């Protein structure tokens, strides 16, 4: 289902723990990481799609999470030209997304990325709240920044809700 502007309706999911960290998932067989996301099927509401994707990609059910917030508007990103499938009709040039902020209510051991017959992810970890904005693939970065800025007051105290001006350097453990 592609809209008239060439965007595929989609939901994005930010899952946070009680420490304000967020679930960061590694794409299956790749070195890229992102938040869970997926398309909205015909006849589905964004919330219904979110719960379906939550189960398919993370193995969690409605009872395992609590919705804390959702984005007020659709957020869009364009795909790089090399990723656009020009031979399909209609051509999808990007995604328009509604995002949900969820609080994990179950034990993290219940997270199971392998419930689907075609898993999207093969690993996950908890990361600091702003980490994904710096680490996601570049064409999604603006949407991630906007999502995290919108959700920040819900996750953390107001004085900490702005992204850091200069992101801390990433360091690998040596030795």
UniProtKB/Swiss-Prot annotation:
Domain of life according to the entry: Bacteria
EC number: 3.6.1.-
GO cellular component, one term: cytoplasm
Keywords: Hydrolase
Keyword Hydrolase assigned: yes
Enzyme class at the top of the EC tree: hydrolase
Residue interval(s) of motif Nudix box: 38-59
Swiss-Prot/TrEMBL cofactor(s): a divalent metal cation
Keyword Hydrolase (UniProt): yes
Residues annotated as domain Nudix hydrolase: 6-149
InterPro entries: Nudix_hydrolase, NUDIX_hydrolase-like_dom_sf, NUDIX_hydrolase_CS, NUDIX_hydrolase_dom, RppH
Pfam families noted in UniProt: NUDIX
Ranges annotated as spanning the membrane: none
GO biological process: mRNA catabolic process
SUPFAM superfamilies: Nudix
GO MF term (any one): mRNA 5'-diphosphatase activity
Alphabetized PANTHER family for the sequence: M7GPPPN-MRNA HYDROLASE (PTHR23114:SF17)
Task performed by this protein: Accelerates the degradation of transcripts by removing pyrophosphate from the 5'-end of triphosphorylated RNA, leading to a more labile monophosphorylated state that can stimulate subsequent ribonuclease cleavage.
HAMAP family tied to this protein: Nudix_RppH
Similarity remark: Belongs to the Nudix hydrolase family. RppH subfamily.
NCBIfam families: PRK00714.1-1 (NF001934), PRK00714.1-4 (NF001937), PRK00714.1-5 (NF001938)
Designated name of the protein: RNA pyrophosphohydrolase
Organism: Yersinia enterocolitica serotype O:8 / biotype 1B (strain NCTC 13174 / 8081)
Biological classification of the source: Bacteria, Pseudomonadati, Pseudomonadota, Gammaproteobacteria, Enterobacterales
Annotated gene: rppH
């Amino acid at each position: 289902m592609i809209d008239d502007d060439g965007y595929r309706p989609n939901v994005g999911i930010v899952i946070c723990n009680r420490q304000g960290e967020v679930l960061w998932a590694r794409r299956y067989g790749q070195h890229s990481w992102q938040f869970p996301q997926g398309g909205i099927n015909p006849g589905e509401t964004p919330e219904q799609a979110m719960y379906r994707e939550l189960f398919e990609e993370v193995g969690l059910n409605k009872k395992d999470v609590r919705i804390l917030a959702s984005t007020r508007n659709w957020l869009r990103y364009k795909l790089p030209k090399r990723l656009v499938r020009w031979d399909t009709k209609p051509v999808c040039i990007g995604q328009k997304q509604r995002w949900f902020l969820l609080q994990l209510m179950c034990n993290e051991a219940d997270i199971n990325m392998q419930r689907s017959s075609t898993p999207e992810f093969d690993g996950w970890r908890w990361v600091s709240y702003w980490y994904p904005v710096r680490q996601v693939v570049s064409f999604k970065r603006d949407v991630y920044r906007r999502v995290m800025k919108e959700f920040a007051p819900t996750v953390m105290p107001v004085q900490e809700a702005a992204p850091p001006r200069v992101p801390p350097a990433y360091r690998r453990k040596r030795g």
